[in-house]
């Protein structure tokens, strides 16, 4: 057989895949009615051709595609690891099958039309693997790439996936076509162009040609499609006609798919979540050899599930190795709760076939101790009609049939007929015994039942708004799956089992029906103080501000937990003691129709439970009064207020029914008991205390910060004061030195010629005014550095006496003025050829103008590079200087002056390179200018800026620029020396012009021409006396 199927593709392609991909369902052409391609490839072969490194085509890299373009191509799903959600899907622990089916997503739909070629549960939600279990097949072992089972499972519906992605609506329509018998054939095939269709056609061709080994595997045309004969002559499929007549003794129009499986499921424990669910219409049990190999279970390779760690757990088929009792019970409960609509669509007929005396749907739901009463109402009974009829109009009539059937499930399940029925009863008994120990109540009420049946898409409405507590689904759980779809409602028992199995992450968004919004599971656990799915008191609905509620509930529950635990234990013991009568009641309800039981049992039950109540009240602390425990419990157990007593009995799990009637009769569950009030008071008090503590802590912290800030400010202030003190002392010292110096200068006797001082001082005053702009520049720099109060104007130096003049100048202007006027003191002697008789104070009135002019020249000369005037003065001393003068010059160099380009460059570079910003840049520049040796320059820069490349580069550039600066200064100095000597000689000649003859006078006049200099060199013109200017112009 296998040899025939190896000839699918060309030799090279078979070699590529190791020839082992017989089991892969190859992709199909779009329309099955055309002639099929000669070459069809398996999934491994196609995966082998997938190139991961393919780049985005250039034409797609346009801006218009930027919004939809992804740089990384999506991998084939087979190569991607399964998500957490998909792993959970394998055990059908994640979504209610009914919800999936109603959404048109598959998950083992019991509708005849959906099962083609692979068994009824082959169609998987979103094309990502069976939602109930993992089918191990030969694919796994000898696939070309040896993919792990998870990955194979991931892509078992390789070609379904793309089609599902784009043809959902068609699939949904097609899913129902099976009901319409012959006429539905073509639509069915067109609705789903996937591997089943091409395989079925191929099998038919091969049957005609070779008498196929896969006899009867392909669906037949039209009416025959589900009624083809199996090799043993009996009806080969669990068709919804033959099988119903043959095995059920009554006819079902709805559940052909599942028909043949009742036996297997009944024995196997009926757990759709972990157990292998039957694969009709191929009739696995009867017709294994009538199916294609890839669709059959290997004898060695059974189906199974994955546990939380990802390990594969093989599960033998039900009839061969029944599952241990406890596991069975778990699974039974899980299936019933987790697939609410199974009450109609799976459990119903299955219940009819497999357990002919089923729990009615509502009881199935309540068999799990869960605080969510409406699973049954939601999807059960005519959920099929109400929910799916809207989604799938084409199948409306079939839905109506389903509706007629499913109340039958509740009311007349049919007479017990088979071995299955006895086993079903056994299972019910065992389950009842096991669940009797659980505390929660999930009773159903008729009003809720009908309301829920009329509510379409309750999942979404429940998710969007909080349901009232009286609503059946108010205490059930909803969650958002990773795709953002809301799943639910699920009972607490289901959620607890999935949580224990490790399916829920802490970030899963969950909510109860009565809560307003979704919250991460981790938050809910913190808020409740326990796992919310475990038995225990349930907090009130979370409405409004979630954060406040979260804190409140957390503390409230922590306080109530211990107290409630005791009540629960006592209650458990009391309930367990009434186990047998309740079991009997339950069986009665299961066997009979759902009419109210005869009056005596409810009355007895009521009396018994009233006795329970009295015993329970003895347990209560005195503070609470009669209703301390009961309202809280009734609220936490989500028992609705209304509802007839018989309702509770027939629909609830045994002890839960009793408990419900107990709470319903004596208490109105909507009243809030004193316990809750006390808890809330305690909680408020605790909150208030926490707020006070927090405020106190914040106040202390604030005080600490303020204290720290105050200390820092004081330190800062102290440092600033010290700096100011230092600066002030420095200035005082400079002032003293200047005064000394000036006093020494004044010690030279001044002839008391009455006419000489006025012109001299007038000239000086005029000069002071002309220097004002330079001084302002200097003062502005100093003001910026030291934030000193603005100095007084130098113009105040117009006092007729030089002492008054000195006192009138401000501190900084005095320094600057004296520094600028420095050449005055040594000026005459420098160029006077050693004539000690000619001092500043000895000049005649005539010479005053020339001297002042000489002074103006000096000042204007030194403005472009004032720093050089000092070195110029100290570099060529002609007369002796005292130590005070030298100190004064050094001090003056530290005072900011108008900067030349070189100094500015130095300061900018140092500011830039000083990483900490703590470097005293002006001081560093002054020192660098004084340091002669290049090595010393390098050392000093290294000490200031560190041994970095930038520092070395700066040192190098500094030396080069300084050399250029010095060269230009020397040239300037020579020129200035020559000019100053000429001006002094002119002044001398003008002073003694009366003694000279006319020839000498003209010679002197000619020499005065040398004073004429281009203003562009100095930056400004010289202001001498008007007579001098005339003498220049005369020439």
From Swiss-Prot:
Bias (Acidic residues) ranges = 295-304, 324-349
The record's annotation in SMART domains points to: GYF
Enumerate composition-biased segments (Low complexity): 367-378, 406-417, 857-874
Q: What's any GO biological process attached to this entry?
A: insulin-like growth factor receptor signaling pathway
Q: Compositional bias (Polar residues) at which positions?
A: 629-639
- InterPro entries recorded for this chain? GRB10-interact_GYF, GYF, GYF-like_dom_sf
Q: What does this protein do?
A: May act cooperatively with GRB10 to regulate tyrosine kinase receptor signaling. May increase IGF1 receptor phosphorylation under IGF1 stimulation as well as phosphorylation of IRS1 and SHC1.
Q: Which PANTHER family match?
A: GRB10 INTERACTING GYF PROTEIN, GRB10-INTERACTING GYF PROTEIN 1
Q: What is this protein called?
A: GRB10-interacting GYF protein 1
Q: Which organism does this record belong to?
A: Homo sapiens (Human)
């Amino acid at each position: 057989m296998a040899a025939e199927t190896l000839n699918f593709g060309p030799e090279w392609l078979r070699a590529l895949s190791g020839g082992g991909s017989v089991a892969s369902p190859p992709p199909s052409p779009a329309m099955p009615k055309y002639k099929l391609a000669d070459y069809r490839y398996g999934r491994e072969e196609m995966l082998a051709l997938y190139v991961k490194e393919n780049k985005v085509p250039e034409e797609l890299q346009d801006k218009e595609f930027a919004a939809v373009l992804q740089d990384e191509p999506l991998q084939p799903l087979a190569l991607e690891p399964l998500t957490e959600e998909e792993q959970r899907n394998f055990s059908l622990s994640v979504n209610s099958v009914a919800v999936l089916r109603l959404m048109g997503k598959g998950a083992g739909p019991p509708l005849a039309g959906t099962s083609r070629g692979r068994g009824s549960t082959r169609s998987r939600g979103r094309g990502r693997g069976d939602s109930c279990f993992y089918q191990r097949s030969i694919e796994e072992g000898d696939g070309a790439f040896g993919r792990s089972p998870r990955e194979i499972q991931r892509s078992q519906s390789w070609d379904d996936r793309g089609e599902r992605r784009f043809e959902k609506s068609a699939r949904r329509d097609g899913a129902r076509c099976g009901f319409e018998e012959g006429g539905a054939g073509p639509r069915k095939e067109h609705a789903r162009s996937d591997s089943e269709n091409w395989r079925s056609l191929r099998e038919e061709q091969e049957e005609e040609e070779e008498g196929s080994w896969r006899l009867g595997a392909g669906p037949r045309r039209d009416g025959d499609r589900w009624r083809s004969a199996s090799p043993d002559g009996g009806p080969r499929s669990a068709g919804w006609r033959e099988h119903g007549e043959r095995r059920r003794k009554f006819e079902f129009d709805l559940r052909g798919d599942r028909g043949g499986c009742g036996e297997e499921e009944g024995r196997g424990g009926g757990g759709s979540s972990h157990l292998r669910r039957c694969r009709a219409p191929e009739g696995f049990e009867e017709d294994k050899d009538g199916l294609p190999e890839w669709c059959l279970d290997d004898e060695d390779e059974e189906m199974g599930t994955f546990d939380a760690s990802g390990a594969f757990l093989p599960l033998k088929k039900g009839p061969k190795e029944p599952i241990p009792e406890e596991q069975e019970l778990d699974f039974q409960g899980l299936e019933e709760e987790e697939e609410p609509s199974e009450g109609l669509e799976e459990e119903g007929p299955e219940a009819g076939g497999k357990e002919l005396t089923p729990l009615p749907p509502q009881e199935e739901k309540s068999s799990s101790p869960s605080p969510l009463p409406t699973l049954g109402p939601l999807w059960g009974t005519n959920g099929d009609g109400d929910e799916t009829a809207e989604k799938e109009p084409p199948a409306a009539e079939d839905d109506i049939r389903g509706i007629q059937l499913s109340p039958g499930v509740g009311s007349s399940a049919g007479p017990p007929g088979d071995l299955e029925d006895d086993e079903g009863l056994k299972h019910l008994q065992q389950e009842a015994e096991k669940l009797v120990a659980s505390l929660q109540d999930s009773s159903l009420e008729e009003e809720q039942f009908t309301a829920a049946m009329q509510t379409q898409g309750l999942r979404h409405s429940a998710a969007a708004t909080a349901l009232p507590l009286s609503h059946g689904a108010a205490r059930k759980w909803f969650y958002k799956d990773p795709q953002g779809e809301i799943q639910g409602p699920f009972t607490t028992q289901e959620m607890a089992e999935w949580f224990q199995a490790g399916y829920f992450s802490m970030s899963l968004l969950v909510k109860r029906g009565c809560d307003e919004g979704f919250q991460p599971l981790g938050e809910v656990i913190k808020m409740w103080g326990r796992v919310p799915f475990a038995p225990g008191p349930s907090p009130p609905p979370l409405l409004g501000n979630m954060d406040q509620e979260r804190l409140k509930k957390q503390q409230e529950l922590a306080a109530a937990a211990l107290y409630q635990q005791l009540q629960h234990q006592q209650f458990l013991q009391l309930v367990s003691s009434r186990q047998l009568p309740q079991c009997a009641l339950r069986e009665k309800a299961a066997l009979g129709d759902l009419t109210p039981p005869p009056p005596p049992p409810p009355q007895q039950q009521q009396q018994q439970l009233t006795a329970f109540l009295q015993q329970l009240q003895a347990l209560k602390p005195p503070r609470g009064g009669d209703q301390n425990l009961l309202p809280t419990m009734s609220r936490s157990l989500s028992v609705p207020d209304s509802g007839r007593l018989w309702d509770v009995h027939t629909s609830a799990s045994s002890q839960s029914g009793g408990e419900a009637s107990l709470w319903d009769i004596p208490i109105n569950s909507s009243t809030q008991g004193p316990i809750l009030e006390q808890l809330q008071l305690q909680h408020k008090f605790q909150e208030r205390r926490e707020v006070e503590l927090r405020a106190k802590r914040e106040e202390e912290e604030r005080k600490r910060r303020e204290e720290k800030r105050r200390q820092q400010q004081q330190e800062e202030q102290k440092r600033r004061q010290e700096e100011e003190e230092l600066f002030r002392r420095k200035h005082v010292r400079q002032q003293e030195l200047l005064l000394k110096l000036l006093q020494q200068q004044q010690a030279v006797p001044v002839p008391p010629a009455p006419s000489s001082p006025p012109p001299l001082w007038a000239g000086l005053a005029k000069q002071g005014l002309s220097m004002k702009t330079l001084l302002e520049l200097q003062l502005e720099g100093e003001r910026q550095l030291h934030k000193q109060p603005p100095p007084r104007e130098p113009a105040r130096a117009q006092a007729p006496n030089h002492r008054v003049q000195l006192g009138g100048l401000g501190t900084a202007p005095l320094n600057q003025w004296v520094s600028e006027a420095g050449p005055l003191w040594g000026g005459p002697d420098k160029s006077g050829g050693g004539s000690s008789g000619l001092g500043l104070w000895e000049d005649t009135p005539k010479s005053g103008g020339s001297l002042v002019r000489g002074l103006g020249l000096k000042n204007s000369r030194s403005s472009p590079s004032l720093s050089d005037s000092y070195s110029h003065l100290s570099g060529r001393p002609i007369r002796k200087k005292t130590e005070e003068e030298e100190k004064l010059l050094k001090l003056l160099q530290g005072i900011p002056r108008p900067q030349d380009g070189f100094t500015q460059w130095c300061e900018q570079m140092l500011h830039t390179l000083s990483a900490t910003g703590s470097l005293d840049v002006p001081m560093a520049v002054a020192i660098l200018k004084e340091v002669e040796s290049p090595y010393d320059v390098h050392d000093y820069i290294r000490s200031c800026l560190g041994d970095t490349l930038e520092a070395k580069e700066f040192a190098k550039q500094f030396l080069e620029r300084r050399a250029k600066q010095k060269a230009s200064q020397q040239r300037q100095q020579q020129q200035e020396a020559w000019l100053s000597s000429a001006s002094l000689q002119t002044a001398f000649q003008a002073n003694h012009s009366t003694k000279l003859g006319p020839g000498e006078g003209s010679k002197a006049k000619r020499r005065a021409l040398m004073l004429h200099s281009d203003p562009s060199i100095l930056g400004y013109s010289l202001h001498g006396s008007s007579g001098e200017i005339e003498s220049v112009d005369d020439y």
